[in-house]
């Protein structure tokens, strides 16, 4: 039976090796954490840094699951028309002023990189941390070395600032303290969604992304062991 791992390309495998190497160099050294990050990245970008894919061929019901209240005021015909225009769609779902951007900048700062960093404020923060102006040059987030360092910085900073009760809910005290992949996947998924997302919402997994990551994490553990 063919598995997800049987279908990984040479480029994907090379990128995984590079990401693991950089995690070790930058301080994420627990293979249980590393495998969870890889599992989440696998469903976000498949290890090829890229801009967020079009939703024009996505069922409206799934769009509603993903974007919730941001699209609830559109009826079916309106949502179908909206998703047919990528720029208009991303401006509608991401053009939120509270993230430091104007209503017509949602498309410009849509998801990019390995973990689909989104919103102008997140681009600025990620760029400032590595000394590159990602606000001016957002497509640079799709370059593997930049995407990898932004990915690692994102999770390291996220776990450093995580509320202690959030980490305790996943039986952890810091990013390298996980003892089970169930906890590490849950925490990494929660961090990627934002710690403001309740654990109950993470566990309910309306989009199926967490289940996908959980189904792959053990395979990534084995890959990491083989790289050692």
Regions found by a protein language model. Name each.
Residues 2-18, 42-157:
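Peptidoglycan-targeting cell-wall enzymes and recognition modules
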Residues 20-31:
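Helix-loop segments that flank and shape redox-cofactor active sites
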Residues 41-45, 119, 165-205:
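Acidic helix/loop microenvironments that form the catalytic cleft of cell-wall polysaccharide enzymes
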Residues 123-142, 160-173, 179, 198-201:
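Substrate-binding clefts and substrate-entry loops adjacent to catalytic sites
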Residues 188-228:
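Low-complexity, Gly/Ser/Thr/Pro-rich intrinsically disordered linker/tail segments
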């Amino acid at each position: 039976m063919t598995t997800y791992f049987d279908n990984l390309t040479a480029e994907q495998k090379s990128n995984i090796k590079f990401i693991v190497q950089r995690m070790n160099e930058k301080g994420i050294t627990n293979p249980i954490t590393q495998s969870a990050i890889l599992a989440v990245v696998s469903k976000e970008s498949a290890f090829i840094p890229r801009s967020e894919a079009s939703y024009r061929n996505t069922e409206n019901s799934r769009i509603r699951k993903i974007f919730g209240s941001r699209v609830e005021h559109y009826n079916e015909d309106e949502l179908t028309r909206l998703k047919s225009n990528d720029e208009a769609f991303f401006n509608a779902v991401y053009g939120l002023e509270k993230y430091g951007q104007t209503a017509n900048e949602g498309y410009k700062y849509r998801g990019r990189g390995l973990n689909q960093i989104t919103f102008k404020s997140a681009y600025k923060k990620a760029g400032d941390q590595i000394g590159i102006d990602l606000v001016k040059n957002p497509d640079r987030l799709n370059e593997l070395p930049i995407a990898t360092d932004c990915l690692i910085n994102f999770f390291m900073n996220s776990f450093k600032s995580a509320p202690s009760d959030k980490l305790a809910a996943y039986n952890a005290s810091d990013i390298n303290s996980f003892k089970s992949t169930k906890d590490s996947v849950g925490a990494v998924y929660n961090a990627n969604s934002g710690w403001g997302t309740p654990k109950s919402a993470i566990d309910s997994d309306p989009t199926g992304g967490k289940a996908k990551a959980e189904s792959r994490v053990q395979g990534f553990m084995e890959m990491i062991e083989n790289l050692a």
